[in-house]
Swiss-Prot record:
Keywords: ATP synthesis, ATP-binding, CF(1), Chloroplast, Hydrogen ion transport, Ion transport, Membrane, Nucleotide-binding, Plastid, Thylakoid, Translocase, Transport. Belongs to the ATPase alpha/beta chains family. This is ATP synthase subunit alpha, chloroplastic. It catalyses: ATP + H2O + 4 H(+)(in) = ADP + phosphate + 5 H(+)(out). Its main location: plastid. PROSITE patterns: ATPASE_ALPHA_BETA. ATP binds at G170, D171, R172, Q173, T174, G175, K176, T177.
Amino acid sequence: MVTIRAEEISNIIRERIEQYNREVKIVNTGTVLQVGDGIARIHGLDEVMAGELVEFAEGTIGIALNLESNNVGVVLMGDGLMIQEGSSVKATGRIAQIPVSEAYLGRVINALAKPIDGRGEILASEYRLIESPAPGIISRRSVYEPLQTGLIAIDSMIPIGRGQRELIIGDRQTGKTAVATDTILNQKGQNVICVYVAIGQKASSVAQVVTTFQERGAMEYTIVVAETADSPATLQYLAPYTGAALAEYFMYRQRHTLIIYDDLSKQAQAYRQMSLLLRRPPGREAYPGDVFYLHSRLLERAAKPSSRLGEGSMTALPIVETQSGDVSAYIPTNVISITDGQIFLSADLFNAGIRPAINVGISVSRVGSAAQIKAMKQVAGKLKLELAQFAELEAFAQFASDLDKATQNQLARGQRLRELLKQSQSSPLAVDEQIVTIYTGTNGYLDQLEIGQVKKFIVQLRTHLRTNKPQFQEIISSTKVFTEQAEALLKEAIQEQMELFLLQEQT
């Protein structure tokens, strides 16, 4: 017979009492009333916050956007095919955030910061909210450093500074993405982190951009955030904010960043789709009333912070697509009013073989001139004026039969200047090479050449300067001024090369 020891039993009971942990877990839950088209209607979730993440029984995550009296409208971050009517949903108590780290450089990710390039997981210990407040007025300083795009037309006449928002706007197939990707390629060796956000693009187009970056060695300082045309509207809407959160992470670590949103028209369309399905009242062009706020809160995050916050910056180049050149549509006018200037790409110029097809007359940079280097200001001052006068004369010359000599000379000069601004894709130019090109054109050295010879001569002149007069490049890069010595070197090089070129052309 087993003897029962009272002391042993009391010890076991005491131990169990000490171990007892009365933990009350309160979970805010609800049930699915209806699901479809990327939207779910939930009954319950009484204490859910606007923008809070909710989790469905089968694992799908959603965002609570509409808080109504009898139900909650949730947008799904996935296809939601396994969600059933009547299944449970619980509030997570969190709002959308993503992991951030240096390890994201060189990777292709989706709007949830998950890698989609098949190269394994990305390690990150820090998190950042997708929606962060933009720096306030006191936290900013005015733009003063240049961000070189490598495109002569932009760097000379529509300069961009670090911390600026410059819109790239134009019809489809006018080279908007090409301008943006060339700008990223030109940041090589400039210590600038680039984020390229593709929203609603064809997967083949995104793959092509990524391949270009890899071939040109740009992927090592670039992050690509991609949500293609077949992605849920919620993820297309979130992608720009994910890109902005990653760029901000580097900006607040005193790094210069450049972010490209390609394009915000598609994000607005995704947001319109979500809003209409949530039965929010439609406004102009069926967009919801807060579509301006959608873009303003995104673009205001690009800034040049004050020196108290470090020497970082975040430059944004949003892209907007127009229909038949109509810049007075709702989304284009909204984004034009938010940004610090716009680069307008014209389908007519593109079809005429002028590429990049930048319409210099209506393109403007409101703050960039403060950031332009002195050397560029010195040589590019009269370029815009001469091109504007040429465009006016060209339109007039179509109706006039006999033109005087001065007008003919001005037309000839304008045609050669326009030829100088042509640049093939993925071939950005350094600042000193741009200065050489503009100076040669505006000072009439090309007037004696045929239009077809201009490009060839300029290429040879750049090579001649690089090999025989390297001190020219040293002067420009060290002083940032087009000094008398630099001008003398350039004039000498032009004369030497012109003699050589004319001899070659004669033989």
